């Protein structure tokens, strides 16, 4: 019985001891900040890892309107760029206009003689990139024919008219002589000439306008030649006409010469457009134009370019984020997040970074928590925090610099006869987008991995720095904490934080306290052994007492035991 009492008292004494509560010791833990709800990001090694903070890299919505600053945006309203160039009567307001971006609306329409352009997309692109409709009339001499043909399908006011940049030539009297006209380019810039050929709806209309049963138009330069023969025949009626005009174009280089030969059906140029090299463009959009500032425009509206990627539209103009297929990509701008546990430590005490993070840190990403004779406290470590922030800052800007396009992505158009080219172009564009989408995901995963690794490294650096300062004056308790074997008040803790701690001052006291404490301190393993031994002895004593009672009762006759075989 005495043995049992002694063991119980010893067990109670063991658990009543708290190694960190003495006035001659202190506990110092290192940790990093945490948040209750972090953000999931992707790294090279993990599909989902929680961090304290992250920045979205994909712009997924526009502002819903096109900003007229930082670019000169020209609203085409009811006119397409080509109609404005040809001089459709209802587009006269656009003559001599300039633009960085010409906006074509879905409500745009032609209101003159019906026409087609076999290479519409190329002509549209050339005129759009020039950024101007500057036109210069030239003195072409057309002898023996009637100029300035008009049509009831093309009203200028209430009068019949025609495209202002083209000259429709028809017979004069009963003749249409062969025309041979030359026009040299003596300037130092490229000239764009627009011309066409008329396709009558019937043979009767052909001879009525041009005498000959079939005309021909040949336009040549030193570098090229085009010969077009009219296709006579009825077509669907458009604005009262079943005939058509096909529009063609020729670029004449400096020192070259334009030659026009025709015996009928010619729609002649009146002059040239001056071609300019630039980054102007054209875009189809119904978004309203408003006064605001944006460096990136899409058909959906302008978008900010403070992110490296966008998922709004493949067609862009200006300094724009790269288009990718992902709706979201998050860049880690904080460390690995380990939410703080409510109960920490073996005795409910403070715990270090290996166990969990610390919520509520406002003065740094890394810091110290301590228990000493003056109580408990917490303080951030600015140096390690700044080192981590300096490495993370600029990541977003570097990603933007790598990905933002400093040019526009124009729309691609092809005629039906170029269907195979269109399919090939679509395949190439889709492949480019897939490649960029993969590269974007890989780039962000690499950056996230680097961010998490470097923030973990800063935590380890701070721990090693503290351990080297304390040396033999403290013991690594595991979990990111140290037990300091000397009295360490708040001033002492402050010297450890700022790197001025002198372990020689406390060395003798620490060694003395360490030996005293080690003499009586029982490790958790010994506590377990004492518990098991105490339990075993108690069970044995209970069995002995019970057996003795049974034997005593049998001897007194109070209990009878019958054994039957």
Swiss-Prot record:
Record topology, Cytoplasmic segments: 551-565
Domain of life per record: Viruses
InterPro entries noted in UniProt: Capsid_hemagglutn, Hemagglutn_HA1_a/b_dom_sf, Hemagglutn_influenz_A, Hemagglutn_influenz_A/B
PTM entry text: Palmitoylated.
Entry GO CC: host cell plasma membrane; membrane; viral envelope; virion membrane
Extracellular side: 17-529
Site entry: Cleavage: 344-345
Subunit structure: Homotrimer of disulfide-linked HA1-HA2.
Additional remarks: Major glycoprotein, comprises over 80% of the envelope proteins present in virus particle. The extent of infection into host organism is determined by HA. Influenza viruses bud from the apical surface of polarized epithelial cells (e.g. bronchial epithelial cells) into lumen of lungs and are therefore usually pneumotropic. The reason is that HA is cleaved by tryptase clara which is restricted to lungs. However, HAs of H5 and H7 pantropic avian viruses subtypes can be cleaved by furin and subtilisin-type enzymes, allowing the virus to grow in other organs than lungs.
Protein family membership: Belongs to the influenza viruses hemagglutinin family.
Function: Binds to sialic acid-containing receptors on the cell surface, bringing about the attachment of the virus particle to the cell. This attachment induces virion internalization of about two third of the virus particles through clathrin-dependent endocytosis and about one third through a clathrin- and caveolin-independent pathway. Plays a major role in the determination of host range restriction and virulence. Class I viral fusion protein.
Protein name: Hemagglutinin
Gene: HA
